[in-house]
Amino acid sequence: MLKLLLLVLFMLLGAANAAPPRFAAVLPDERLEFPRDHGAHPDYRTEWWYATGWLSTPDGKPLGFQVTFFRAATEHDRANPSKFAPGQLVIAHAALSDPAEGRLLHDQKAARAGFGLAYAKTGDADVKLENWTFKRQADRAYRTRVEGAEFTLDLLMTPTQAIMAQGEQGFSKKGPHPAQASHYYSEPQMKVSGSVTRRGKPVAVTGTAWLDREWSSSYLDPEAQGWDWTGVNLDDGSALMAFRIRGKDGSVLWSHAALRDSTGRVTNYAADAIAFTPQRSWTSPRTSAAYPVQLAIRTGDIVWQLTPLQDDQELDSRASTGSVYWEGAVTVSRNGQPAGRGYLELTGYLKALKL
């Protein structure tokens, strides 16, 4: 915690004499290009590599996992040649959901990029924060390793399907104004193998993961409170992504959903065809935030029911990104029939999210 506080203090002191940089704008005519867009985009304000999934132990017990690396450009002048200038920050979160524990196990790190200790490289996915790593290998598989205080994840995630460009060929609107957008793509249905270590004992795991890649310079409307998002790997090989951005007045500022079937055909749903309906809430005993952990999401004539693996999947990241949110493994039914498993993210329920 002290290291993080010193880092923030150093940034604020330096910013007093720094010329504010001009961040790159998200433009609708810019197309995704690979492997370039697997890597970092340092000219944009915010970016993340976000992997979630379900794992199974040899005795069949389910686990949920989340590994996220963030890159954030600061207000410091990027033309400053000093190696000590904190122009980029790297932040990481990791979490493990296990009903046997009854709570979310999680950890976090943050550091300014530089000196080989923290970086987010351009050209392909290669992100490091001390001994936490996320890298795309020559065979297209992603390898991530994080060593938390209560657990270690060492996972290999291998794509089995084509990249799913979200929105309009990767241009994803997040509000009515042109600047409120991101470049966004997903890699659903990834095959996972590796190990989870707790209390010094590694256990082999297999499973299925979802990777989200997103970068932006102006993500949220000033009146936004937070968002609800889900990414679901469906049992028939399909993939569902849906989100809504909630206003501070309780309204829905923006929403979008996309369903890609097993043949690769994508159906995009506009706001008038989408509805998020809370079914049950859980109140955190630590923060008193109430989260709608059980949701029904309607996309067109389909109703998806999301049920949490466990209620307590609250992640307190105030020591790194400053936010508290709920992010957890969920089972999913389609019109009342079991259909798949995924992750649900609920932000802005303690206080408005700033991004």
Language-model features, listed with the residues they occupy:
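Structured soluble/peripheral alpha/beta segments that form catalytic or ligand/cofactor-binding pockets
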Residues: 19-355
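Bacterial N-terminal signal peptides
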Residues: 3-14
